[in-house]
Amino acid sequence: METEQAPRPAEPPGDLTTAITAPGEQLLTLLDRHLPRIRAQAAPNDRDSTFPAATFHGFARDGVLGATVPAELGGMGVSRLHDVAVALLRVAEADASTALALHAQFSRGITLTYEWLHGPPPTRKLAERLLRAMARGEAVIGGAVKDHGRETTRLRPDGSGGWLLSGRKTLVTMAPIATHFVVSAQAPAAGGTTLLYAPIVARDTPGLSIVDGWTGLGMRASGTLDVAFDDCPVPAGNLLARGSVGAHSDAALAGQAVSSVAMLGIYVGVAQAARDLAVETMARRSATPPAASRTLVAETEARLYALRATASAALVNVDELSPRHDMDPDERGRRMMTPFQCAKVMVNQLAAAVVDDCLTVVGGATYAAEHPLARLSRDVRAGRFMQPYTYADGVDYLSAQALGLERDNNYVSLRATRPVDSR
């Protein structure tokens, strides 16, 4: 993503401990005010699957929800994904569900900023309007990507220049408070081509409904619900073009990497929180820790270092390549996505291993549902299901890159070509 800031090296490099820009430091300072409340509410919100709406109202008041909006539009101007990841890491140490929901808002600020800078005039106008509303704390924008069951979310012309949207999305994070949704949808075109669009739909649009009742294994307080669309009217100016199904264009990978790579910080934060709980528990015990427990603690320290270094390298890579619009678009997309996917595989594996070992160190008390390590053990597993890519799709992508195999790497397009019972 574009930036005029002069970043300085993190101290120590690759540690994901500090921000590298002044706006990033400002964001961390603001978040520090909210961390005690987030930490205190994590357990009851997880138990009851309650979204922390009051916390997000506080975020709106303090400007946190506009952190990734450019300063020219009233936002904080955090543009380095490294700094976004550090912020999410801090929040995830207190509560991963809150961090996941906040990521959805941060990601939208980043991607809409790109549309504002590089999109056609109608798109720039739409992006500016939404970004200014985000900066004021008035717009909370969720992403609705995954179709529910066998349904396919589709657009069709309304006969007067606009569109009608129908379908149902699942796993829509931050749905309880979202004012808008960016929806992945398909529309037929001449010649049998199927086009991909991202209509932006306001919550109060006729035909839109929030479907409550989701009970997840982890991230239970993230407000992850279903959203249904029944002939929702969408003005032509509220539509973002996203290519076509089966185009095999890797240029789309750049935007997908930019919008998702900072999420690595969430799972580093979960692993760090588990480590801290385990070490604090051992320190309170009067007996000298047994050799087996000390071995697990030592391995946890090494894994945490690897986690932070791996995630940091992927973030730096995306930050450096994001403004390189002089490159071949497909090559740029692959060079941003491939290190991200290598890091995602390792972060997901190592973070889960850290949490599992911390359960072993602390012992049987962690088997109680209310123990904080029990919550962390469920939350950390969400990473394997996040796009791009899920673990299975990530294996397909990385192995195809290594072996030179042809495939459609745009997961939105690829999903549209799969049989409905395998999505």
From Swiss-Prot:
Pathway: Antibiotic biosynthesis
Organism: Streptomyces rubradiris
Gene name for this UniProt entry: rubN8
InterPro entries (alphabetical): Acyl-CoA_Oxase/DH_mid-dom, Acyl-CoA_Oxase/DH_mid-dom_sf, AcylCo_DH-like_C, AcylCo_DH/oxidase_C, AcylCoA_DH/ox_N, AcylCoA_DH/ox_N_sf, AcylCoA_DH/oxidase_NM_dom_sf
Main function: Nitrososynthase involved in the biosynthesis of rubradirin, an ansamycin antibiotic. In vitro, catalyzes the double-oxidation of TDP-L-epi-vancosamine to TDP-L-epi-vancosonitrose. In vivo, probably catalyzes the formation of D-rubranitrose, the nitro sugar moiety of rubradirin.
EC number: 1.14.13.-
UniProt protein name: Amino sugar nitrososynthase RubN8
Taxonomic superkingdom: Bacteria
Family: Belongs to the acyl-CoA dehydrogenase family.
One GO biological process term: antibiotic biosynthetic process
